[in-house]
Curated annotation (Swiss-Prot):
Protein name: Protein SDS23
UniProt xrefs under InterPro entries: AMPK_gamma/SDS23_families, CBS_dom, CBS_dom_sf, Ssd23
Description of what induces expression: By the antifungal drug fluconazole.
Family from the record: Belongs to the SDS23 family.
An annotated GO BP: regulation of mitotic metaphase/anaphase transition
């Protein structure tokens, strides 16, 4: 087991000695020893009158004035040892420094004037008003109002009449993962009742035009006029999808309603994090924040933004100390049954699996369940142009290699984001990784269960990236490792002794034959592995843990189960039965755009998709769906 991370040492400062004449000061410690006992699982509102501890930011970190009798000690000095990189990376960032702090007014001149020296010495004197005013009080996070998390930036939204292409361009232009969609007929900016468009909707759009989704898999209950017959609704849906395949514009509202989501929950900006934490801890990805009157949305709060806020302000929330220093195994959070995709399966299969499972990410593994990488629903944006459409029928590993090479070109350096931890990793380290990688989940691996070929290779590798089971820095697999293996996998698929590779792949997809272990590629040893995949920890798990600490009951799978129930509703099943009885919809039939209903194969899919990738809706240079 990895020892609990130790704190960073505080640099000695003359200011500390002059401002703490009444005994040693206690410094807020989120990673100290002895570890505090777990807080009681109940919600206890805090007030300013009962606060006994305040912290003051300095150039070396944060210090606090602790009331007599307080047992809350955070950082402990260990002069005999140096702080490890793991401890540093597991520690929350320091609180912001006040620009008016007198320490920033010290003159750097070699010949400072007498008056300036005098003013400086007076400003550093004990009991300085500036220091007192700069104190950060330690608070209960559950009492934080949502106004503290509402950004002043203009809220970006679109109208339901916008096309899918326009909605996609809005995400790209503003670097968003979702955007509110107004459904008001009178005011296009009215978000009182709204939907959301995200990359899962774009994935649905792509799969539809590729003939990869059956009518029975769609949520058509809310499509069109509620008073129309099942036959009329079926005709409307198929006609609209045919328009998409021909490259014509399709309203974004149509695609959104085909892909079930959780209700768009709203909170007043006067509400606190107490209730919001419960909602997001139950698997809802984002909520809307409204003004006091409740008639205008002022912001969107997502799981990712909330976890970043909690991390950046962790030193203000002493109740988090116990959890941040505990390991995943101790806290018993996370799932032991992550959804995966094999490295040699096609990318289109991964996208379809995310659609079916209603998840936004898959772990990429080899046949020995060694974690290879990660594929996200956001990655679908990289295959919306005709020049990249061939990647849909390449291996997932090949696509990961492409993403890494593109990232290297854009940022000018080789990178491999750390998307994995182990059961002995502290929650503080997990949150730090989630914030740094802007991820929604981290895969849990067991490094002791690596394949023998990997063990021997890693033993001979001087920079294996492992330190007592803890991954430090950017570990292998490096870009070159993934690229080399991707080439080997692709090469092996092109040298089948039975039949030509292209014909074999097309035949396999055309007949609907799934990729199995028997058709897998030869076993290429992955010499820079991470370990066996044993679980996954998500933002939902962590936020649910925080909510549970305040007495709230959460179920991390609640929102996902609701989405799955929506996708298989009895209402839609009854519609399908009615259509089948009338001879309109054969059982299990796919939505098609030609007379060949059975052709959902590789060659047919490429032909169908070529229209959407080449059709120019606006200006070619502005349209992500046009040929590049």
């Amino acid at each position: 087991m990895v020892n609990p991370p130790q704190p960073r040492q505080m640099p000695k400062s003359p200011r500390l000695s002059t401002s703490t004449s009444s005994g040693p000061s206690a410094v807020p410690n989120l990673l100290g020893s002895p570890r505090p006992s777990p807080p009681q699982l109940q919600h206890q509102p805090s007030s300013a009158s009962t606060s006994s501890t305040t912290s003051t930011a300095t150039t070396g970190g944060s210090i606090s004035a602790t009331a007599p009798g307080s047992t809350q000690h955070y950082l402990h000095h260990h002069p005999s040892r140096k702080t490890s990189i793991v401890e540093i990376l597991s520690s929350p960032p320091p609180l912001p420094t006040d620009p008016n702090d007198p320490i920033h007014q010290l003159s750097l001149s070699r010949h400072a004037s007498t008056s300036s020296n005098k003013s400086s010495s007076q400003s550093i004197a004990p009991g300085s008003t500036a220091i007192t005013n700069h104190a950060f009080s330690l608070v209960d996070w559950s009492e934080i109002p949502l106004t503290e998390l509402t950004e002043s930036n203009k809220l970006i939204s679109i109208h339901s009449s916008h096309s899918v292409q326009s909605a996609f361009e809005t995400l790209l232009k503003n670097n968003l993962t979702s955007v509110p969609v107004s459904i008001s007929k009178s005011d296009p900016h009215d978000l009182t009742n709204c939907l959301t468009f995200d990359y899962s909707d774009l994935n649905t759009y792509l799969l539809l035009i590729m003939n990869k989704i059956n009518y029975s898999e769609l949520n058509v209950d809310d499509i069109g006029d509620p008073n129309i017959s099942p036959q009329e609704r079926h005709e409307f849906v198929t006609q609209t999808i045919s328009k998409a395949k021909r490259g014509e514009e399709v309203p974004v509202e149509f695609i959104i309603k085909l892909h079930p989501k959780n209700p768009f929950i709203k909170f007043n900006e006067t509400d606190t994090l107490f209730s919001v934490m419960e909602t997001l801890g139950n698997g809802v990805h984002r909520i809307a924040i409204t003004n006091e009157e409740g008639n205008k949305i002022t912001g969107i709060l997502s799981q990712r933004r909330l976890i970043k806020y909690m991390w950046e302000n962790a030193r203000r929330f002493p109740s988090l100390d116990f959890y941040l220093t505990s390991t995943l195994q101790d806290l018993k959070i996370g799932s032991s049954n992550p959804i995966t995709i094999y490295e040699d399966q096609m990318l289109i299969e991964a996208l379809h699996k995310m659609f079916n499972e209603r998840v936004s990410s898959l772990a990429v593994i080899d046949r020995s369940r060694t974690l290879i990488g990660n594929i996200s629903i956001v990655d679908v944006k990289n295959v919306t142009s005709s020049k990249n459409s061939h990647l849909l029928f390449k291996s997932v590993l090949n696509f990961i290699s492409y993403n890494l090479s593109q990232k290297g070109i854009e940022e000018g350096q080789d990178q491999f984001p750390i998307f994995h931890v182990n059961n002995q990793t502290s929650l503080g380290r997990v949150i730090a990784k989630l914030v740094a990688t802007q991820s929604h989940r981290l895969w849990i691996v067991d490094s002791s269960r690596q394949a023998s070929s990997m063990s021997s290779a890693s033993a001979s590798a001087p920079n294996s990236g492992m330190n007592n089971g803890v991954t430090v820095g950017y570990p292998a697999p490096a870009d070159s490792s993934i690229t080399d293996k991707a080439e080997e996998v692709e090469a092996s698929s092109m040298s089948s002794p039975q039949l030509n590779a292209a014909a074999a792949a097309a035949a396999a997809v055309a007949t609907g034959a799934p990729t199995t272990a028997t058709s897998a590629q030869p076993d290429f040893s992955y010499t820079s592995g991470t370990g066996k995949l044993v679980g996954v920890v998500t933002l939902t798990d962590i936020l649910g843990l925080f909510a549970t600490s305040k007495g709230r009951r959460t179920d991390p799978q609640a929102a996902r189960n609701q989405r799955r129930r929506s996708s298989t509703s009895t209402t839609r099943s009854s519609i399908d039965s009615a259509l089948s009885a009338e001879g309109i919809l054969p059982s299990g039939s796919a939505i098609i755009g030609s007379s060949n209903a059975a052709n959902t194969g590789r060659r047919g899919s490429v032909e169908v998709s070529s229209d959407v990738f080449r059709k120019s809706y606006t200006k070619a240079q502005e349209n992500a769906f046009s040929k590049e």
